[in-house]
Amino acid sequence: MIFQRTVKEMVKTTGVGLHSGNKVTLTIKPAPVNTGIVLVRTDLTPSVAIAAKADQVRETTMCTALVNDEGVRISTIEHLFAALAGLGIDNATIEVDAPEIPIMDGSASPWVFLLQSVGIQEQSAAKKYLRIKRPVRVEDGDKWAELRPFKGFRVDFAIDFNHPEIARSQQHMVMDFSSSAFVRDISRARTFGFMRDIEYLRANNLALGGSMENAVVLDEYRVLNPDGLRYEDEFVKHKILDAFGDLYVAGHAIVGEFRAFKTGHALNNQLVRALLAEQDAWELVSFEKEEEVPVSFAVPAGAVLA
């Protein structure tokens, strides 16, 4: 049987909030089976917990943000959630003393390192997967995203940026997900932005924590970061990273194929909501025998299982 997983012990880190520019402290704690991922704002009195569910995503401008019915928000969850999804962590309590998750280096790599450093604990209950039974698709103009039946988890993703540096890179990628492939090929891809947009955002008191330390920055013609790119196709890989995090608010790892063109946080969330609303399009499954498990969901790379 494949079991649910949590972190083996508590781990804490600090970083900078992308929009506020302020120091943020974040703590990840083990959680019991069937808890899911729960975020807690510890800077409020009393503290406020928000379950990571698709219907709690109420802001998708430049990031994915959870917002409860009282308007309490936790922004920029997607890179941390990509790491949780990539390492197969089902249950965790995440405490944060600010309205946003720290941006770290703009990728999921610091979160992967943090989670692997404390290890992953197998738990006593069967892991549940969300298996796609029939296609579900959402569209917005020429942008679209869909989930289709597939034995495993495959991503077929394309972007289309009219920028000379991005146009020179590969803007389409197909990958069969595995934890090791995520860590090696996707997790280090950083968020990217254009200098003209950053200047506008800062003028409006946004992106105050953004810098070349946590993003790939481009002008009209080239990448401005002195060290260049981490992957030749870092742009499309980061969009895939974002999608991994955005899809994880479905509450379970997905068994299916995710196909998308020019999608972002908003359309990713619309897809998850559309899927969950069409209950005949999916089912929750567990795998009793090791040989039944799609190769995508083997034990995570670097996991310390007890």
From Swiss-Prot:
Belongs to the LpxC family. GO terms for molecular function: metal ion binding; UDP-3-O-acyl-N-acetylglucosamine deacetylase activity. It is an enzyme of class 3 (hydrolase). Its cofactor is Zn(2+). Zn(2+) binds at residues 79, 238, 242. GO terms for biological process: lipid A biosynthetic process. GO terms for cellular component: membrane. It catalyses: a UDP-3-O-[(3R)-3-hydroxyacyl]-N-acetyl-alpha-D-glucosamine + H2O = a UDP-3-O-[(3R)-3-hydroxyacyl]-alpha-D-glucosamine + acetate. This is UDP-3-O-acyl-N-acetylglucosamine deacetylase. InterPro entries: Ribosomal_Su5_D2-typ_SF, UDP-acyl_GlcNac_deAcase, UDP-acyl_GlcNac_deAcase_C, UDP-acyl_N-AcGlcN_deAcase_N. Keywords: Hydrolase, Lipid A biosynthesis, Lipid biosynthesis, Lipid metabolism, Metal-binding, Zinc. PANTHER family: UDP-3-O-ACYL-N-ACETYLGLUCOSAMINE DEACETYLASE 1, MITOCHONDRIAL-RELATED (PTHR33694:SF1). SUPFAM superfamilies: Ribosomal protein S5 domain 2-like. Signal peptide: none annotated. Its EC number is 3.5.1.108. Catalyzes the hydrolysis of UDP-3-O-myristoyl-N-acetylglucosamine to form UDP-3-O-myristoylglucosamine and acetate, the committed step in lipid A biosynthesis. Pathway: Glycolipid biosynthesis; lipid IV(A) biosynthesis; lipid IV(A) from (3R)-3-hydroxytetradecanoyl-[acyl-carrier-protein] and UDP-N-acetyl-alpha-D-glucosamine: step 2/6. The active site is at residue 265. Disulfide bonds: none annotated. It comes from the Bacteria.
